[in-house]
């Protein structure tokens, strides 16, 4: 595909004043009620009382991004102090005791008598709960279970003599099925400040010493000369990897629910571009294991034609610069480093990161410029909101960053930080920003022919907000003039959304098909977190987090009107079969019941508390 942007030549006078869903507006005129998902009469269930209609606010991107909402009624709101830490085995085996020599004897422990872990394998096996019935999903797929004797499906890959089985044929066939960006050996140098970040130190000095542009010409020339001297040998923006986001199917970075197993599922369902969960730059450069885990990806996310991006946010330019260097050098296969200028979390905002960068355009420009200096051939992109308050500032910020010529793509979420989800995303403003970028990027490209400090390919514009159907996606591209649409909630509630976009039709997935998605998520989760007791509990927890979104899907076959709207609320309904009703339950105990189909019975050690004290959209079982 050509790097040249395909811009529809539409006369300004031919454009509507506002972007509207004409089909939806026509249905409203014919009797459809705004804000209500009308259910066909045969699927309605009588309510026990009028009070049952009260429901807390629907799910929103802020929750997916780890954000907070203003206080709600006491009966609703969030369980902010919920405990999600899963307990591990009561008896912990020494890793050496689980590794065997060729003669079948266990490896000797380097700690000897001082080791605090168990070495008696039989004692450990007797302490384990009864094996889960069936075949280990990891062994079934890959031919080998990394958890070995700790696996909850141990009997499925252990012979009569007690030895672990390996299916060499499957193992060889799945050699490319692996996770990337395990950087454990580099964490210690980062923690001890021994990792070489001299390139970043050099760039930071340059950024700190830069002279304001409105000074006299002599000083400006001096600045340019110093820039060239310090920057010699560094990869220029014009030499970086070229992004292609035109018409791509993009999944938004999502806190908690945007984990690696979920992204693998979305890759199977047609996603082209995925992102890791947002990482904080200071913990990255300090070598925090948990933060670096957010940069991991699966091999399927970086195959040809696919893109994986690492998203970071920073309150200081020096943190962003050092993190960009470390990420670009230690992570393989990444297509971009995305700077989050839209995160609404209060803790992040108060530090001057996330959406706070929207109001500090000079600082944001320095951050992007510095990150681009040290990120090698990895381009820098920016995700933002319309602004922090009622006055939108995104257009001004994009103009500033475009002038710098270091930003490969902008993603604009059509809401402000303060607005949150009180209103729909403002796609008219997104169009205004997109048009300004399209009109400017030709000039930027011409400038790049004379100055290799400027990117040489189009600066893409991606819209974000309220995309739930194929018509939402295509209307955004056609009328808002964005190059593509980043989907967040729509891909959580309805993971097959890109299949609908591709076929341009509403797809009525059965309960059986939706269960297959959960089964695949469970399999990917066990590969990622492990098939031992801890891994099973982690997989179950994140599958429940996933279902806290998917249960909000109202099957299109029971709706009176299509297209469905994400924020429309249905009345109490029942599905076309018992399982469909169960999958629509807002009771988290029903979600746990569904997980037992793939992960076995729930043990006493499992802990899960839903994000909400109560859940919206009650069904017959909820």
Swiss-Prot record:
A zinc finger (C3H1-type) spans 88-122, 135-160. It comes from the Eukaryota. Residues 66-75 have a biased composition (Basic and acidic residues). Keywords: Cytoplasm, Flavoprotein, FMN, Metal-binding, mRNA processing, NAD, NADP, Nucleus, Oxidoreductase, Repeat, tRNA processing, Zinc, Zinc-finger. It is an enzyme of class 1 (oxidoreductase). FMN binds at residues 253-255, 311, 383, 413, 464-466, 488-489. One of its GO terms (molecular function) is tRNA-dihydrouridine47 synthase activity. PROSITE patterns: UPF0034 (PS01136), ZF_C3H1 (PS50103). It catalyses: 5,6-dihydrouridine(47) in tRNA + NAD(+) = uridine(47) in tRNA + NADH + H(+); 5,6-dihydrouridine(47) in tRNA + NADP(+) = uridine(47) in tRNA + NADPH + H(+); a 5,6-dihydrouridine in mRNA + NAD(+) = a uridine in mRNA + NADH + H(+); a 5,6-dihydrouridine in mRNA + NADP(+) = a uridine in mRNA + NADPH + H(+). It holds the Pfam family Dus. Residues 47-59 have a biased composition (Low complexity). Its EC number is 1.3.1.89, 1.3.1.-. Disulfide bonds: none annotated. The active site is at 343 (proton donor). Belongs to the Dus family. Dus3 subfamily. This is tRNA-dihydrouridine(47) synthase [NAD(P)(+)]. It comes from Yarrowia lipolytica (strain CLIB 122 / E 150). The gene is DUS3.
């Amino acid at each position: 595909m050509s790097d040249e942007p395909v811009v529809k030549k539409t006369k300004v006078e031919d454009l509507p004043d506002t972007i509207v869903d004409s089909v939806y507006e026509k249905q409203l005129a014919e009797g459809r009620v705004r804000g209500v998902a009308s259910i066909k009469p045969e699927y309605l269930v009588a309510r026990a009382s009028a009070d049952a209609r009260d429901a807390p606010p629907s799910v929103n991107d802020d929750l997916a991004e780890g954000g907070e909402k203003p206080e709600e009624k006491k009966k609703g709101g969030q369980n902010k102090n919920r405990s999600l830490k899963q307990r591990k085995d009561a008896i912990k085996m020494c890793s050496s005791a689980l590794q065997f020599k060729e003669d079948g004897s266990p490896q000797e422990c380097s700690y000897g008598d001082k080791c605090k872990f168990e070495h008696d394998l039989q004692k450990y096996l007797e302490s384990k709960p009864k094996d889960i019935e069936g075949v280990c999903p990891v062994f079934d797929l890959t031919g080998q279970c990394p958890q070995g004797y700790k696996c909850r499906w141990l009997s499925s890959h252990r012979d009569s003599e007690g030895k672990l089985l390996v299916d060499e044929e499957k193992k060889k066939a799945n050699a490319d099925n692996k996770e990337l960006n395990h950087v454990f050996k580099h964490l210690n140098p980062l923690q001890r400040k021994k990792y070489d970040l001299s390139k970043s130190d050099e760039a930071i000095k340059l950024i700190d010493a830069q002279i304001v542009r409105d000074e006299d010409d002599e000083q400006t020339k001096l600045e340019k000369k110093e820039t060239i001297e310090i920057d010699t040998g560094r990869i220029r923006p014009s030499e970086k990897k070229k992004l292609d986001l035109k018409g791509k199917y993009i999944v938004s970075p999502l806190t908690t629910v945007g984990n690696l197993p979920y992204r693998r599922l979305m890759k199977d369902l047609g996603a082209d571009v995925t992102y890791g969960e947002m990482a904080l730059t200071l913990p990255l450069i300090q070598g925090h294991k948990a933060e670096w885990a957010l940069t991991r990806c699966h091999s399927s996310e970086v195959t040809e034609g696919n893109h994986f991006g690492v998203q970071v946010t920073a309150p200081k330019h020096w943190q962003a610069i050092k993190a960009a260097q470390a990420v670009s050098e230690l992570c393989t296969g990444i297509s971009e480093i995305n700077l989050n200028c839209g995160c609404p979390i209060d803790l992040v905002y108060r530090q001057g990161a996330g959406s706070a960068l929207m109001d500090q355009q000079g600082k944001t420009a320095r951050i992007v410029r510095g990150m681009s200096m040290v990120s090698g051939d990895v381009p820098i992109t920016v995700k933002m909101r319309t602004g922090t308050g009622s006055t939108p500032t995104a257009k001004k910020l994009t103009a500033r960053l475009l002038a710098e010529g270091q930003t490969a793509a902008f993603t604009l979420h059509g809401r402000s930080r303060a607005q949150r989800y009180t209103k729909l995303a403002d796609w008219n403003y997104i169009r205004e920003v997109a048009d300004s970028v399209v009109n400017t990027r030709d000039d930027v490209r011409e400038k790049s022919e004379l100055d290799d400090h400027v990117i040489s390919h189009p600066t893409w514009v991606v819209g974000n907000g309220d995309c739930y159907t194929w018509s939402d996606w295509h209307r955004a591209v056609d009328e808002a003039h964005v190059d593509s649409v980043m989907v967040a909630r729509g891909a959580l509630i309805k993971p097959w959304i890109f299949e609908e976009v591709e076929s341009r039709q509403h797809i009525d997935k059965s309960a059986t098909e939706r269960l297959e998605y959960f089964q695949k998520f469970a399999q990917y989760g066990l590969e990622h977190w492990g098939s031992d007791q801890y891994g099973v509990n982690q997989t179950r927890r994140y599958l429940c987090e996933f279902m806290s979104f998917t249960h909000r899907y109202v099957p299109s076959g029971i709706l009176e009107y299509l297209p469905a709207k994400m924020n429309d609320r249905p009345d109490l309904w029942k599905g076309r079969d018992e399982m469909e009703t169960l999958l629509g339950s807002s009771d988290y105990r029903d979600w746990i019941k569904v997980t037992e189909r793939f992960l076995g019975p729930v043990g006493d050690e499992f802990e899960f508390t839903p994000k909400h004290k109560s859940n919206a959209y009650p069904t017959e079982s909820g």
